């Protein structure tokens, strides 16, 4: 009879105890989760999956900031977006007359779908599957809106070709609220000048376009150019002599030529 403390007895007790614990785990597998087995099962899931997994890996630079790989262009889901630009009554007839010059830039350059809705008196824009520029719809809306404000088609097309052009609108009474009746008419006349010469002089000196629509003034051009033109128009509204304003414009024009 071997001693109770023999090594053979210890091996039998240990081997006899192992199946019991495994059986208990198998019976209670819905409640008990072994940490070691779960870690082993999760290893294949977290393993890198070739090149695709390397693209999504996050690396950390020397300063401790995360560095991600550049995103790749993927085929996104096509979604239709629409815009509706209302047309004022006094600009609907010019819109019909110039429609053959308005829709080609929108269709050929921006790849948009355009429709002139006569019933609702609006121009409807919609993206298509050929539209590649994300800002095409906004550019098309700005182009049509510029025409409805009174700008020529050739001037409005510049909004499609250049990205640094803006439109700024304000009313004469925003500058001087006390203008009424004949005083308001004289202020408008000072801005236009005789036969529109002063307005053209401001446009040529500042490289902008100005539209006088009753009591509203619309400016089209670059940011700094609009500020210079607006300052000249405000000076005329406040009563400055046209000669003084024109002299200041000549100085500003010479400075702008030296800058560019």
From Swiss-Prot:
Q: Which Pfam families match?
A: KH_PNO1_2nd
Does this UniProt record's set of keywords contain Phosphoprotein?
no
Transmembrane residue ranges: none
- Where is the major localization of this protein? cytoplasm
Q: Where in the cell is it found?
A: Cytoplasm; Nucleus, Nucleolus
Annotated KH domain ranges read 181-233
Keyword Cytoplasm set for record: yes
Q: Which GO terms describe its molecular function?
A: rRNA primary transcript binding; unfolded protein binding
The family database entries (InterPro entries) matched by this protein are listed as: KH-I_PNO1_first, KH_dom_type_1_sf, KH_PNO1_2nd
Name the PANTHER family on file: RIBONUCLEASE Y, RNA-BINDING PROTEIN PNO1
Protein name as annotated: Pre-rRNA-processing protein pno1
This chain is encoded by the gene named pno1
